[in-house]
């Protein structure tokens, strides 16, 4: 039985491996260049009281750099996972859109967190989506465009017209039922038809991560420490 009902284990494992490999390369590079990079000597001293040794502080700094790499690529991970769902296509990094479903006439731009794009840049995203689904655009005419925030600002679901503030005029962008903003849990349900699809992915990831690290990346017997404590963060983000 597959870990997830909506994509194969091999597709899930491959995407997990891609992300973990990027993180490992970043960590290895950071270790090699740690002393050659400019470290804030003042900040390091103010951080020192929070650690029991310089080695502990150094490991924390390396972990922080690795964490930043992971966070920068998690949005792409979701894009690729959803692109494996039947009927959906991942358009790749730098594509005109992130996800496409021609049969359902849906396009989507996927961001990992509500704070990835903020302020006046949101109006630019609206404008870009508006141009894509406008009658003048032959390929996506009359499609529904979604701006997806996988992690919402608050733990509530939403799927509503996308009306960010226009930085030029100070007014809201016009409401259009075919230009929408949606949280990650709701979008996963829209894509898969499964109300808890995003939580199912989150629950499957510990096994997938342990398998990839142990079987493909040379960390035999790896197990995520204190797994239940990490699992609880899903409820805080999504309610």
UniProtKB/Swiss-Prot annotation:
Reactions that this protein is recorded to catalyse: Endonucleolytic cleavage of DNA to give specific double-stranded fragments with terminal 5'-phosphates
Disulfide bonds: none
EC identifiers of the protein: 3.1.21.4
Domain of life: Bacteria
Molecular function as annotated in GO: DNA binding; type II site-specific deoxyribonuclease activity
Signal peptide interval: none
Record Pfam families: RE_Eco47II (PF09553)
Enzyme class, UniProt record, top EC level: hydrolase
Keyword presence, Ligase: no
Transmembrane segments: none
GO-annotated biological processes: DNA restriction-modification system
Keywords: Endonuclease, Hydrolase, Nuclease, Restriction system
Reported function: A P subtype restriction enzyme that recognizes the double-stranded sequence 5'-GGNCC-3'; the cleavage site is unknown.
Name the record gives this protein: Type II restriction enzyme Eco47II
Organism whose genome encodes this protein: Escherichia coli
UniProt gene name: eco47IIR
């Amino acid at each position: 039985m597959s870990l997830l009902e909506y994509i194969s284990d091999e597709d899930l494992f491959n995407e997990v491996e891609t992300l973990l490999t990027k993180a490992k390369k970043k960590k290895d590079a950071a270790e090699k260049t740690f002393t050659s990079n400019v470290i804030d000597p003042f900040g390091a001293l103010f951080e020192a009281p929070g650690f029991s040794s310089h080695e502990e502080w150094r490991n924390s700094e390396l972990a922080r750099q690795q964490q930043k790499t992971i966070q920068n690529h998690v949005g792409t991970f979701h894009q690729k996972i959803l692109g494996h769902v039947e009927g959906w296509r991942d358009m790749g990094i730098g594509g005109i859109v992130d996800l496409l479903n021609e049969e359902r006439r849906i396009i989507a731009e996927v961001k990992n967190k509500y704070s990835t794009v903020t302020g006046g840049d949101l109006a630019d995203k609206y404008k870009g989506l508006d141009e894509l689904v406008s009658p003048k655009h032959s390929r996506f005419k009359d499609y529904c465009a979604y701006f997806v925030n996988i992690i919402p600002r608050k733990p509530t679901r939403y799927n509503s017209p996308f009306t960010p503030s226009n930085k030029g005029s100070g007014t809201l962008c016009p409401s259009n039922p075919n230009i929408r903003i949606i949280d990650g849990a709701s979008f996963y349900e829209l894509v898969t038809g499964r109300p808890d699809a995003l939580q199912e992915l989150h629950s499957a990831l510990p096994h997938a991560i342990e398998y990839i690290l142990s079987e493909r990346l040379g960390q035999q017997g790896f197990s995520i420490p204190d797994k239940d404590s990490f699992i609880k963060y899903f409820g805080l983000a999504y309610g």
